[in-house]
């Protein structure tokens, strides 16, 4: 933020070094990653100094963190969890405290320590459970670089911060720099962080909370709890606003004329033409989000989680995604970025219908329904101009080809 003084920057750097050292010492002591640690506090508590002082920002230093940067200096406290958290202290006590010589007594002692595993202070999520681009995990509370028990809202706010910082860089440049290389590098770093936070939001869709905690008093309590329909729907709404809608990337407009990297050899083919490749970069980011939302693992999970509480059906999920990609300019002028996005989405739906695809018959049926619905909308729409009309005809042609192929 603009309020970061030299003193605050030094504080941030010191805390990051403290985090790095504590994290690696934790590994030396046998601690694995705990990617549920950062979900310890509520979003509002991240700016409360008394809570930070007593509990920390995370229950574990073994997570991967993003810095907590407030919009104002008055609300800025710690930036990162830089010392062992409550989970770490508990796990280390279990492994290193002095035990009893009697094996039966020692077993009971360790069982007593482990019995507090279900309290929030001791929440744990390992690498293989983490929800990320690979879709290896499906609990949205177990993610890398997320923050708070409301990660979608933290990430939404972080994306808004990135927009402001990016626009400020475009207006003022990098102080003391005559070359645009540093501006180029910083804008790219911000752009990558924007995507990371969008993926954290996307993890809510089809998300299922789970726990392996052993509960003696209630062995039949649910181990899988789907994310509420409201939260999943809101996640798509946030993605619509920040990634899919027309103008979602307008915050970058002023930076495009300055995005010229220094020439450093000839090995990187990406820089051969020197231009900032606006449409390619933005489509690439949108593709990553669609990779997450339309992955066969995720879509099948949405279907299966309906058997244990998920009320956000596959048809509703795909309909909301279709609305996010088509509704805003159905009868309005359409820009190149939205053209690319709409074509990309239709191609993905087409691939879902292929006979040898990874998608189940249930998912293929839902994709088929979406294609019919989109084609109906496009045919009814009054194109804003000839360019929009040609684009819509191209989409209709692609849908018709895919449908006729299935027949």
List each language-model region with its residue ranges:
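Short pre-active-site segment immediately N-terminal to the catalytic Zn-binding motif
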Residues: 2-21
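Active-site recognition of the HExxH zinc-binding catalytic motif
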Residues: 19-34
């Amino acid at each position: 933020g603009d309020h970061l003084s030299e003193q605050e920057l030094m504080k941030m750097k010191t805390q990051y070094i403290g985090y790095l050292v504590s994290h690696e010492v934790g590994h030396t002591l046998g601690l694995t990653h705990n990617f549920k640690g950062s979900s310890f506090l509520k979003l509002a508590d991240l700016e409360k100094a008394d809570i930070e002082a007593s509990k920390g920002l995370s229950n574990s230093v073994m997570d991967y963190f993003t810095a907590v940067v407030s919009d104002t200096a008055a609300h800025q406290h710690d930036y990162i969890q830089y010392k062992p958290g409550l989970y770490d202290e508990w796990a280390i006590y279990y492994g290193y405290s002095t035990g009893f010589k009697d094996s039966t007594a020692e077993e009971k002692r360790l069982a007593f320590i482990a019995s507090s595993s279900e309290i929030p202070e001791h929440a744990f999520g390992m690498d293989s459970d983490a929800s990320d681009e690979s879709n290896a995990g499906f609990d949205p509370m177990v993610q890398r670089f997320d923050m708070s028990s409301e990660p979608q809202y933290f990430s939404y706010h972080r994306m808004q911060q990135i927009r402001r910082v990016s626009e400020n860089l475009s207006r003022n440049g990098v102080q003391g720099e005559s070359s645009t290389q540093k501006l180029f590098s910083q804008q790219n770093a911000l752009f990558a962080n924007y995507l990371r936070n969008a993926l954290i939001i996307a993890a809510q869709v089809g998300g299922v909370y789970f726990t392996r905690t052993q509960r003696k008093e209630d062995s039949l309590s649910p181990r899988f709890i789907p994310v509420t329909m409201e939260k999943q729907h809101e996640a798509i709404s946030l993605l619509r606003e920040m990634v899919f809608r027309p103008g979602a990337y307008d915050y970058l407009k002023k930076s495009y004329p300055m995005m010229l990297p220094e020439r450093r050899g000839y090995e990187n083919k990406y820089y051969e033409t020197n231009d900032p490749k606006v449409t390619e970069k933005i489509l690439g980011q949108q593709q990553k989000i669609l990779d997450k939302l339309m992955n066969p693992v995720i879509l099948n999970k949405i279907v299966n989680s309906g058997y244990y509480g998920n009320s956000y059906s596959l048809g509703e999920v795909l309909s909301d995604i279709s609305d996010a990609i088509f509704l805003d300019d159905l009868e309005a002028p359409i820009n190149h970025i939205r053209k690319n996005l709409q074509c990309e989405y239709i191609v993905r739906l087409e691939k879902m219908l292929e006979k040898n695809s990874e998608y189940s018959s249930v998912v293929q049926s839902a994709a088929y329904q979406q294609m019919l619905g989109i084609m109906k909308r496009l045919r009814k729409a009054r194109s804003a101009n000839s360019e929009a009309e040609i684009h819509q005809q191209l989409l209709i042609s692609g849908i018709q080809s895919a449908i006729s192929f299935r027949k």
